Swiss-Prot record:
GO MF assignments: metalloendopeptidase activity; RNA endonuclease activity; zinc ion binding
Main location: cytoplasm
SUPFAM superfamilies referenced in this protein's UniProt entry, alphabetically: Metalloproteases ('zincins'), catalytic domain
The protein, known as: Endoribonuclease YbeY
Encoding gene per record: ybeY
Native species: Streptococcus uberis (strain ATCC BAA-854 / 0140J)
Length: 166
């Protein structure tokens, strides 16, 4: 999986960047999404607040914002298009590979790690996997959806070695 990592805060250690990258690749393999592409941006609470207001109309910072990429309309082409532009099929497959982007608030991750009594590393991993599942179509609006998503989320984190005691 190709993952673009961006640290807008300048506060994320190389270890956390590498753990996030490794964990998301692990999650991608576990869910059959390893041929996809996404981005992860680490932000402050201030930036998280702005994004939450812009995309979710919620006037407060949040821990992770998941923006699933869904093309507005299908791309239609015919055989003649492929004959005229042999690179078109490859370009479209790359376009189809992009699944979305995550914005993780470093400030919220630190607050929540302390609140829940586990490590910052565990909280960062939790937020990354939670967001990853959202951009892959999982949600928790109903009890059934919540059970499915949270079970898979915990399976991934445990198999990776990031337990609540981590």
């Amino acid at each position: 999986m190709y993952i673009e990592m961006i640290d807008e805060t300048g506060l994320v250690s190389q270890e956390i960047m590498e753990q996030t990258l490794d964990l998301l690749n692990f999650a991608a393999r576990k869910t059959g999404k390893d041929e996809k592409e996404m981005s992860v941006t680490f932000v402050t609470n201030e930036r998280s607040h702005e994004l939450n207001l812009e995309y979710r109309d919620t006037d407060r910072p949040t821990d992770v914002i998941s923006l699933e990429y869904k093309p507005e309309s299908p791309i239609l082409f015919d055989e003649r298009d492929l004959e005229e532009n042999p690179d078109l099929a490859e370009m479209l497959s790359e376009f189809d590979a992009y699944i979305g982007e995550l914005f993780i608030s470093i400030d919220k991750a630190k607050e929540q790690a302390q609140e829940y009594g586990h490590s910052f590393e565990r909280e960062m991993g939790f937020l990354a996997v939670h967001g990853f599942l959202h951009i892959n179509g999982y949600d928790h609006y109903t009890p059934e959806e919540e059970k499915e998503m949270f079970t898979l989320q915990e399976e991934i984190l445990t198999a990776y070695g990031l337990t609540r005691q981590s």
